[in-house]
C-alpha cells in the first residue's frame, strides 16, 4: 500500500505518530541519495472520495486536522457526495475541529450534492455551538436543500429547540417565517410549523408562534393542523386549536383536518383529535360590537369593535371566555368579556356544532330570554360532549345544537337555530346577523325535537319547546346522576358524566374503561363508582322489540336528536343501524361517550332481537332458545354491562378466569340449558337476555355449550342463561366473543388463559354460579357442583366448583345435545390443566336431563366419571360410572355417537358420551396439544377422520397412566368403580401432567405415578360397581381421547398461568388440577386429545384400551386397555350400546379411522374387569370402548418386541384398522412383566404396564393420565415388571397412543412404539400391533410392585409387589399367559379383519363379540379376582 493510502489509514485510525512520520519532509540529502524526493499526496482520496482531512474532521481529532492543514491539505475537497471536511465537522458537532477548518478558510455556504450546507447538518443534529459559529461566519440560514428545507426546517423537524431559538433570534428570522410563493402547490412545500406539528414538537411550535409565524400558513397538504391530525399528535392539535388555528381550512384535496382524521386514522388518539376538531369546527365566533377594556381585571380581554372573538367557554358569572388571534404577531390574546359585547357570526360552516349544542342547551332551556352568548358558551364546554355527538342527548336543549354537531356543516344551522332562538327571546346584536341562517337552523332545529321527544322527525316543535324539553330531560337525568353520585360523595364527577352524555341507565352499563374515558382517573374513585354501578338496579331500558323505523327506535332510547345525523350519513333504515360501529359514530359526529355507549348498547340489543327473529326460523336447538336467552339477558346483571362491568363483576357465566364468556357462549349456554331446563331458564328469564345473546347463542350454541359445560364443571356452572350474561355478556356480545372485560379479542386469549388458570383455583371456584340473578337460572348442568363436592376428583380445590365428575346420565341428554358436549369437551383438554376440562354438563345437553340439579349432563365425550363425590353423588350413580361417559372414540368415519345413549341399562351414569370420532381425539394436532388454549375449546372440532396428530413424546404420561393403573390396587381396585373411573381419571390427569417427566419409564415417574395412584387413587377411585354389576363404567368417553387430552396436558405439563405445571397433582387426594379437568373434558374433545395422544404413553396406559382402541378401533374395542386398565372395565361402554362399535377409537391416540366403528357388543355388559392393574399386572382394560363382550379381554400380552424407542420413533402410522397396528403381538409372557423391574420397562413400558385401567375410550383413567400426577414421591419403580410386558404395553400404548406420533416419540415410552396407529389408515408402520379391539391387547404388565403392593392389599390383586397379591399374581400371570395367547389369536383374527377393512358395525360387533366372549372367560376370572381383592 502506498504512502498515501497509509496516511489515510493512519488518520482514520487516529494514529498521529504514523501520520506525522508520513507527512514529515524528507531530508534533502537523504532524499537525493535515495532518489525519493517525491512528496506524499496529502489530498489522496480513497474510493469513497474521502481524503485524510475528511477522516480527521469526522473523527474530530484536532491534532490530525492541524497536521494535515499544515501539510497544505485542501480544505474544501469534496468526497463522492459533495461533502467537504466542514460538513463532516459540523455533522460531528465539535467546536474545536470546526474552528480549525473555518480558520483555514472553508466556505460555509457551499452545499453538498444533496443541497446541504454545514448549517443544515449542525441544525439537524442540534449542535448549538457549531450552528452559532456557522452563523457568525455568515452561513445563510435561508438556504434550502434539495428537499426544500432550510436549516430551521430541519431543526424544527428533529425537535432541536436550542437551534430553533438560535435561528429565530437571528436577523434572518422574518425571512425564515415568511411563506414561500410555491408552498401551496409545491409537493415538497413545507414550513417549520408543519414539520414541528407533524413530529409533535410542542415547544418548537410555541417558539414559532411566538416568533409570529402564520399559524394558518398552508402548503399543499393543508395547515399544520392537517399534519398534526394526520400524524395523531393530539397535544399539537390541542395547542394549535387553542392558538386559534382555523380548523375549517381545506387542503388542495378539499379536506379539512377533521376529514383527514376520519379518512386515515383509527387510533385512540384520533378519537380525541376528532373530538377536538369537531369542537373547533363548531366553535362560536362573535364580532365585537364595541370596544371593551377593563384594566382592573387582569383576566379580561381588551377588544375593539370589529374584532373577531372565538368563544371558548362561559364563565359561571355569565362572562364569556374568548380568544382573539393577532395575525400580525401570530399571538393569541385570551380573556373574559361580557357576553353582550358581541354578535354571533356564522363564519365557519362547521362552526363547532358539538359545542353549540351545549349552548342551545343553556339557551334553549332558558328560553328566548337566554342570551345567545349563553348558548354559544355552553357549546364549548360541551365540546367534549360533542364528541359523543349527544350533547343534545344530554340536554334536550343541547340536542338542537347536537344534531348540527354531527355534521360539521350542521354547525351553521345550529348556529342559526341558536341565533334565531336568541332573537326570539332577547335579540342580541348578533341575533340579526344570525337570522339569515335561520332557515338552516330550522333544519337543525327539527333534528332536536325529534331527538328529544321521539316525535316524528318531520315535525319540529318550536325550538324553544324543543330546547326546553331537551334541557328538561337532560336536566332531570343530570340531576339524577348528580344525586346518585352524591350518595357516595363523588358528585364532583357529575359534570364528567353529564357532559359525556351519560344518564343513569347508560351509567349502569359503564365499565372502568368508560369511567377512565370520561375523566375518572383516580383508581380509588373509579373502583368506588364501579362498585356503585354494579349496585344499580335499573330495569332493562332497551327496546324489547324491533321498532318500525329508526325515528321510533331513537326516541325509545332517548337519542332522537341523532335522527337527522344518522339519516344524513346513510343510516336511514332501522336495519342499517345494526351495522354501525363506534368509529362510525365518531365519524358522523356522535361523539359523546354516553350517547355512543347508549347507541351501541341499543344497537346490540337490536341486533340480538333481529338474530332472535332469524333464529326462530333457523331452527337449531340453541337458536330456538334464543328468545328466552334474550329475556334472560337482563341489564339487571351488574349495571355495567360493558367490559368494565364484566371486569368488575364477572357475569355469572364466566370463564374460569372470571372473564365473562362471550355473549355468544353465554347465549349458547343458556339456550341449551333452556332446552333441558326450560323451566329453570324461565325462572332466570326474569333477566331479560339481550337479543344479542340469542343470536350469538344460535351461532355459538355448540361452543357455548362446551364452554358452559366446562364452566359448570368448574363450578361456575353456566350462570343462568340470563343471569350472568347481563352486563358483561352484553358487552361480550357487543364485542363479539370477547370475554367480558376485555372487549374484543381478549376473549379467545382469555379462554386460553382461563384454561391455564383453571389449574389454579379459578374464579369459577367461587360460587359464581350463585350470581344474584343467575342462581335461579342454573340449568341442570349447573348442578355440576353437586357432584363436585363429593368427588375427590372434582377439580379439587381450584376447580372445586367444577363438577367435571358429575355427569348427568347421558341417556337423559337428548342425543342432539349430547353430541355437542363431546365436542365441548375438547374445549380445553389441551389447555393445560384447564378446568374447562370439565365441560361435562353441556348445557344444551342438560336440557332434557335437567333432572333437577342432577349432575349436569356430561358432554358425551367427557368421561366425567362422577367420582361419586364420595358420598355426595347420588348413590349408585357415583359408582355407576360404568356407562357413564364411555365414549368410544368412534372411528372418524363413525358418526359421533354422542348420541349413543347408553342403554337404559347403562344406569344413570351411562351417559354414553358420543364417541368422539377418532379423528377428533386425534385431530388435535400435537401442536395443539401443546397448549391448545382454545378459548374454551370453543371450536367445536369437526369430526374429521384425519389421522391423529402425533402424540407428544410423553413417556411420563404413559408412566403416569401406568402408575395410575398400578396405583395401589386397594385404591383403584377397592373402589374400582369409583376410583377406576374417577380416580383413574384424576390420576391420569395428575400423573400425566406431573409425571410427564419425559423419561418414558423413568423409575421416578413410575414411582410417582404409583404413589399417586396409591395415595389419591384409593380415595378418589370411584367404587366400581360390584363385578356382577354391569353398570358400565363411565370410562372416559374415549380413553384415547382423554389420554390425548391428558397427554397434551402432560405435554404442556398443564402449565398454569404462573408457569407451574398445574397438571401435576402431588397426590391423588390433591385437588384435581386443570389438567385433570382437561382430561375430563379431554375425553370429550377429540382434537385436543390427539395432543394428549402424544402423551400417549401415559394415556395409553391410562387407557390401555386406548391403544387397543386405536388399533382395535376398527376391530372390537376388545383391545383391553389391557395392561393397565383391566381395572375398570369398559363394560360401561359395552353396555352403552350394542350398536356402538368396539372401535377402540383410540380416540385420542390412535384414532384410526379405518375401523368403521365396530359395533360394540356394547349390549352385553362386560364382566367387571378381571384384572385391575392397580398394583399388579396391568391388564389393560380393553378400551373396547364399550367392551361389548362382557369379558374385558385382558390386554393381549403386550407385544414384547417392539422396543418402545423404535415404535416411538415410528411416525404414527394411521392404522386403518385396529389391526393396522401389527406391532409384534405381545408375547404371552406378560407374566414376566410382573417380575420384571419397572426399570426394564422402557420408561414408557412401565407406564404401559401400569396402564391404568384405561377406561374405555371414555374411561376416567385416561383422564387421570391427562392429569398426569406430578411425580409425587417418585416411588421406586416397581421392581417387578417384565420388560416384555412393558414392551408389549409399550407397543400397545404406542399403538394406541402413537396414533398421533409425537414429535418426540422417544418420550413416549413404549408408546413411542407408537405405531403409527395414530393414523387410522396406516397399519404396517408400527411393528407392534396393538391388540386389535377384539384383542385384549393389553399386556398385563407388572405393576410397579411397590405402589401396587402397598395399595393393593388383598387378594390376588394383581399387584405384583403387593404382598397380598402373590396368589393373585400367580393367577393373574396364568390368566395373563392364557389371555396373551388368546389375545394373540384374537389379534391375528382382528388383523385379518382389519385387513379386510372396516366392516359393517354389526359384523364387527359379532366378530368382536365372539372374540371378546372367547377371551371373556379368562377375564372373568381375573375380574372376579380383582373384584374380590377390591372388596
Curated annotation (Swiss-Prot):
Phosphothreonine: modified positions: 741, 1067, 1268
Region (Disordered): 348-372, 420-471, 669-1000, 1016-1041, 1072-1372, 1389-1410
Key word ATP-binding present: no
A GO biological process held by the record: regulation of postsynaptic density assembly
Predominant place of localization: cytoplasm
Subcellular location as annotated: Cytoplasm
Omega-N-methylarginine: residues carrying this PTM: 398
Gene3D superfamilies referenced in this protein's UniProt entry, alphabetically: Ankyrin repeat-containing domain, SH3 Domains, Transcription Factor, Ets-1
GO CC entries: cytoplasm; glutamatergic synapse; postsynapse
CASK-binding as annotated region, ranges: 375-471
Compositional bias annotation for Basic and acidic residues: 1148-1160, 1389-1407
Residue span, SH3 domain: 281-347
The keyword Phosphoprotein is annotated on this UniProt entry: yes
Compositionally biased spans, kind Low complexity: 669-679, 1284-1299, 1309-1327, 1345-1359
Residues annotated with Phosphoserine modification: 358, 423, 432, 637, 650, 723, 728, 791, 891, 893, 989, 1069, 1259, 1363
Biological role: May link the scaffolding protein CASK to downstream intracellular effectors.
Name the record gives this protein: Caskin-1
Organism taxonomic ancestry: Eukaryota, Metazoa, Chordata, Craniata, Vertebrata
Gene: Caskin1
Amino acid at each position: 500500500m502506498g504512502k498515501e493510502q497509509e496516511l489515510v489509514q493512519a488518520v482514520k485510525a487516529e494514529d498521529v505518530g504514523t501520520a506525522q512520520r508520513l507527512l514529515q519532509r524528507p531530508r534533502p540529502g537523504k532524499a537525493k541519495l535515495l532518489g525519493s524526493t517525491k512528496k506524499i499526496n496529502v489530498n489522496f482520496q480513497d474510493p469513497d472520495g474521502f481524503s485524510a482531512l475528511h477522516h480527521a474532521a469526522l473523527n474530530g481529532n484536532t491534532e490530525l486536522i492541524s497536521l494535515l492543514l499544515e501539510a497544505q491539505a485542501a480544505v474544501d475537497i469534496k468526497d463522492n457526495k459533495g461533502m467537504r471536511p466542514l460538513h463532516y465537522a459540523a455533522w460531528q458537532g465539535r467546536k474545536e475541529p470546526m474552528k480549525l477548518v473555518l480558520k483555514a478558510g472553508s466556505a460555509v455556504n457551499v452545499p453538498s450534492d444533496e443541497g446541504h450546507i454545514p448549517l443544515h447538518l449542525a441544525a439537524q443534529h442540534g449542535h448549538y455551538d457549531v450552528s452559532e459559529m456557522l452563523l457568525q461566519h455568515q452561513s445563510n440560514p435561508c438556504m434550502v436543500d434539495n428537499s426544500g428545507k432550510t436549516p430551521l426546517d430541519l431543526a424544527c423537524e428533529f425537535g432541536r429547540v436550542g437551534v430553533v431559538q438560535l435561528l429565530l433570534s437571528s436577523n434572518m428570522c422574518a425571512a425564515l417565517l415568511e411563506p414561500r410563493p410555491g408552498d401551496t402547490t409545491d409537493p415538497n412545500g413545507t414550513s417549520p410549523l408543519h414539520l414541528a406539528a407533524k413530529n409533535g414538537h410542542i415547544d418548537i411550535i410555541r417558539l414559532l408562534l411566538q416568533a409570529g409565524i402564520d399559524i394558518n400558513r398552508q402548503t399543499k397538504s393543508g395547515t399544520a393542523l392537517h399534519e398534526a391530525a394526520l400524524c395523531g399528535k393530539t397535544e399539537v392539535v390541542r395547542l394549535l386549536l387553542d392558538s386559534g388555528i382555523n380548523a375549517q381550512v381545506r387542503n388542495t384535496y378539499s379536506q379539512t383536518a377533521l376529514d383527514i382524521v376520519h379518512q386515515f386514522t383509527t387510533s385512540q388518539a384520533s378519537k380525541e383529535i376528532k373530538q377536538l376538531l369537531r369542537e373547533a369546527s363548531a366553535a362560536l365566533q362573535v364580532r365585537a360590537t364595541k370596544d371593551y377594556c377593563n384594566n382592573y381585571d387582569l383576566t379580561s380581554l381588551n377588544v375593539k369593535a370589529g374584532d373577531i372573538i372565538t368563544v371558548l367557554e362561559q364563565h359561571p358569572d355569565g362572562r364569556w371566555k374568548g380568544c382573539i388571534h393577532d395575525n400580525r404577531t401570530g399571538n393569541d390574546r385570551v380573556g373574559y368579556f361580557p357576553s353582550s359585547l358581541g354578535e354571533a357570526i356564522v363564519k365557519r360552516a362547521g362552526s363547532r356544532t358539538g359545542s353549540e349544542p351545549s349552548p342551545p342547551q343553556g339557551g334553549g332551556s332558558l328560553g328566548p330570554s337566554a342570551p345567545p352568548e349563553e348558548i354559544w358558551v355552553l357549546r364549548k364546554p360541551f365540546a367534549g360532549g360533542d364528541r359523543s355527538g349527544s350533547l343534545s342527548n344530554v340536554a334536550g336543549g343541547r340536542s338542537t345544537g347536537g344534531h348540527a354537531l354531527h355534521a360539521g356543516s350542521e354547525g351553521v344551522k345550529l348556529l342559526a337555530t341558536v341565533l334565531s332562538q336568541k332573537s326570539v327571546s332577547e335579540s342580541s346584536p348578533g341575533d340579526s346577523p344570525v337570522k339569515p341562517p335561520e332557515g338552516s337552523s330550522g333544519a337543525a332545529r327539527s333534528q332536536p325535537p325529534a331527538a328529544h321527544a321521539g316525535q316524528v322527525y318531520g315535525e319540529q316543535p318550536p325550538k324553544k319547546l324543543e330546547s326546553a324539553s331537551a334541557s328538561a330531560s337532560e336536566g332531570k337525568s343530570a340531576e339524577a346522576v348528580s344525586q346518585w353520585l352524591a350518595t357516595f360523595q363523588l358528585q364532583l364527577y357529575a359534570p364528567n358524566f353529564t357532559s359525556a352524555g351519560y344518564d343513569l341507565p347508560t351509567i349502569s352499563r359503564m365499565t372502568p374503561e368508560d369511567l377512565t374515558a370520561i375523566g375518572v382517573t383516580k383508581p380509588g374513585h373509579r373502583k368506588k363508582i364501579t362498585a356503585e354501578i354494579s349496585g344499580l338496579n335499573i330495569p332493562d331500558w332497551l327496546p324489547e322489540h324491533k321498532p318500525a323505523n329508526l325515528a321510533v327506535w331513537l326516541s325509545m332510547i332517548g337519542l332522537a336528536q341523532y335522527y337527522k345525523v344518522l339519516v344524513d350519513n346513510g343510516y336511514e333504515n332501522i336495519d342499517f343501524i345494526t351495522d354501525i360501529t363506534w368509529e362510525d359514530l365518531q365519524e358522523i359526529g356522535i361523539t359523546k361517550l354516553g350517547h355512543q355507549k347508549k347507541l351501541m348498547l341499543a344497537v346490540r340489543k337490536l341486533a340480538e332481537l333481529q338474530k332472535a327473529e332469524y333464529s326462530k326460523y333457523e331452527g337449531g336447538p340453541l337458536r330456538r332458545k334464543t328468545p328466552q336467552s334474550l329475556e334472560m339477558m337482563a341489564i339487571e346483571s351488574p349495571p355495567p354491562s360493558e367490559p368494565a362491568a364484566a371486569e368488575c363483576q364477572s357475569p355469572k357465566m364466566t370463564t374460569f378466569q372470571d372473564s365473562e364468556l362471550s355473549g355468544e357462549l353465554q347465549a349458547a349456554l343458556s339456550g341449551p340449558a333452556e332446552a333441558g331446563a326450560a323451566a329453570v331458564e324461565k325462572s332466570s328469564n326474569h333477566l331479560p337476555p339481550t337479543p344479542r345473546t340469542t343470536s350469538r347463542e344460535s351461532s355459538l350454541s355448540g361452543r357455548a355449550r362446551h364452554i358452559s359445560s366446562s364452566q359448570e364443571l368448574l363450578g361456575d356452572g353456566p350462570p343462568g342463561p340470563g343471569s350472568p350474561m347481563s352486563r358483561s355478556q352484553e358487552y361480550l356480545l357487543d364485542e363479539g366473543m370477547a370475554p367480558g372485560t376485555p372487549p374484543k379479542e381478549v376473549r379467545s386469549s382469555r379462554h386460553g388463559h382461563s384454561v391455564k388458570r383453571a389449574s389454579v383455583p379459578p374464579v369459577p371456584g367461587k360460587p359464581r354460579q350463585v350470581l344474584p340473578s343467575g342462581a335461579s337460572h342454573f340449568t341442570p348442568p349447573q348442578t355440576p357442583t353437586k357432584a363436585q363436592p363429593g368427588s375427590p376428583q372434582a377439580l379439587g380445590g381450584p376447580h372445586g366448583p367444577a363438577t367435571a365428575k358429575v355427569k348427568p346420565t347421558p341417556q337423559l341428554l337428548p342425543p342432539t345435545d349430547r353430541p355437542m358436549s363431546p365436542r365441548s369437551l375438547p374445549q380445553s383438554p389441551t389447555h393445560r390443566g384447564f378446568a374447562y376440562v370439565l365441560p361435562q354438563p353441556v348445557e344444551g345437553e342438560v336440557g332434557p336431563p335437567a333432572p333437577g340439579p342432577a349432575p349436569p349432563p356430561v358432554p358425551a365425550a367427557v368421561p366425567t366419571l362422577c367420582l361419586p363425590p364420595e358420598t355426595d353423588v347420588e348413590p349408585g350413580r357415583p359408582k355407576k360410572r360404568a356407562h357413564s361417559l364411555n365414549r368410544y372414540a368412534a372411528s372418524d368415519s363413525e358418526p359421533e355417537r354422542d348420541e349413543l345413549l347408553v342403554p337404559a341399562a347403562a344406569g344413570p351414569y351411562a351417559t354414553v358420551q358420543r364417541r368422539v370420532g377418532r379423528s377428533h381425539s386425534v385431530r388435535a394436532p400435537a401442536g395443539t396439544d401443546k397448549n391448545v388454549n382454545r378459548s374454551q375449546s370453543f371450536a367445536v372440532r369437526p369430526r374429521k377422520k384425519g389421522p391423529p396428530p402425533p402424540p407428544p413424546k410423553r413417556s411420563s404420561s404413559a408412566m403416569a397412566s401406568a402408575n395410575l393403573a398400578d396405583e395401589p390396587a386397594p385404591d383403584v381396585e377397592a373402589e374400582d368403580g369409583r376410583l377406576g373411573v374417577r380416580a383413574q381419571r384424576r390420576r391420569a390427569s395428575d400423573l400425566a401432567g406431573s409425571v410427564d417427566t419425559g423419561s418414558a419409564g423413568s423409575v421416578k415417574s413410575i414411582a410417582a405415578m404409583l404413589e399417586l395412584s396409591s395415595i389419591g387413587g384409593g380415595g378418589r377411585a370411584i367404587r366400581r360397581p360390584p363385578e356382577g354389576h354391569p353398570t358400565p363404567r363411565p370410562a372416559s368417553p374415549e380413553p384415547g381421547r382423554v389420554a390425548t387430552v391428558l397427554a397434551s396436558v402432560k405435554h404442556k405439563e398443564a402449565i398454569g398461568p404462573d408457569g407451574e405445571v398445574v397438571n401435576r397433582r402431588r397426590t391423588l387426594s390433591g385437588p384435581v388440577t386443570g389438567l385433570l379437568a382437561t382430561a375430563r373434558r379431554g375425553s370429550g374433545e377429540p382434537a385436543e386429545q390427539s395432543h394428549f395422544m402424544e402423551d400417549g404413553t401415559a394415556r395409553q396406559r391410562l387407557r390401555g384400551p386406548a391403544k387397543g382402541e386405536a388399533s382395535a378401533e376398527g376391530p372390537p374395542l376388545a383391545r383391553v386397555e389391557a395392561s393397565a386398565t383391566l381395572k375398570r372395565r369398559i363394560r360401561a361402554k359395552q353396555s352403552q350400546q350394542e350398536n356402538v362399535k368396539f372401535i377402540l377409537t383410540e380416540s385420542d391416540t390412535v384414532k384410526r379411522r379405518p375401523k368403521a366403528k365396530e359395533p360394540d357388543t356394547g349390549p352385553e355388559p362386560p364382566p367387571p374387569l378381571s384384572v385391575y392393574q392397580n398394583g399388579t399386572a396391568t391388564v389393560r382394560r380393553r378400551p373396547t370402548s364399550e367392551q361389548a363382550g362382557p369379558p374385558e379381554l385382558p390386554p393381549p400380552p403386550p407385544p414384547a418386541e417392539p422396543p418402545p424407542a423404535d415404535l416411538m420413533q415410528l411416525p404414527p402410522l394411521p392404522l386403518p384398522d385396529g389391526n393396522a397396528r401389527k406391532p409384534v403381538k405381545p408375547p404371552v409372557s406378560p407374566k414376566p412383566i410382573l417380575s420384571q423391574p419397572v426399570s426394564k420397562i422402557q420408561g414408557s413400558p412401565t407406564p404401559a404396564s401400569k396402564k391404568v385401567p384405561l377406561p374405555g375410550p371414555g374411561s376416567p383413567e385416561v383422564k387421570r393420565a391427562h392429569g398426569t400426577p406430578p411425580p409425587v414421591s417418585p416411588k421406586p419403580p416397581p421392581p417387578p415388571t417384565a420388560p416384555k410386558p412393558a414392551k408389549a404395553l409399550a407397543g400397545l400404548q404406542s399403538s394406541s397412543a402413537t396414533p398421533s406420533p409425537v414429535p418426540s416419540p422417544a418420550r413416549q415410552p413404549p408408546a413411542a412404539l407408537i405405531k403409527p396407529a395414530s393414523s387410522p389408515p396406516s397399519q404396517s408402520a408400527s411393528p407392534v400391533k396393538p391388540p386389535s379391539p377384539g384383542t385384549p391387547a393389553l399386556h398385563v404388565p407388572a405393576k410397579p410392585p411397590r405402589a401396587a403392593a402397598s395399595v393393593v392389599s388383598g387378594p390376588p390383586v394383581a399387584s405384583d409387589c403387593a404382598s397380598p397379591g402373590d396368589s393373585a399374581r400367580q393367577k393373574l400371570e396364568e390368566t395373563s399367559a392364557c389371555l396373551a395367547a388368546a389375545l394373540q389369536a384374537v389379534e391375528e383374527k382382528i388383523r385379518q379383519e382389519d385387513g379386510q377393512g372396516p366392516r359393517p358395525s354389526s359384523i364387527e360387533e359379532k366378530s368382536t363379540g365372539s372374540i371378546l366372549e372367547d377371551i371373556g372367560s379368562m377375564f372373568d376370572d381375573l375380574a372376579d379376582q380383582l373384584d374380590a381383592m377390591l372388596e
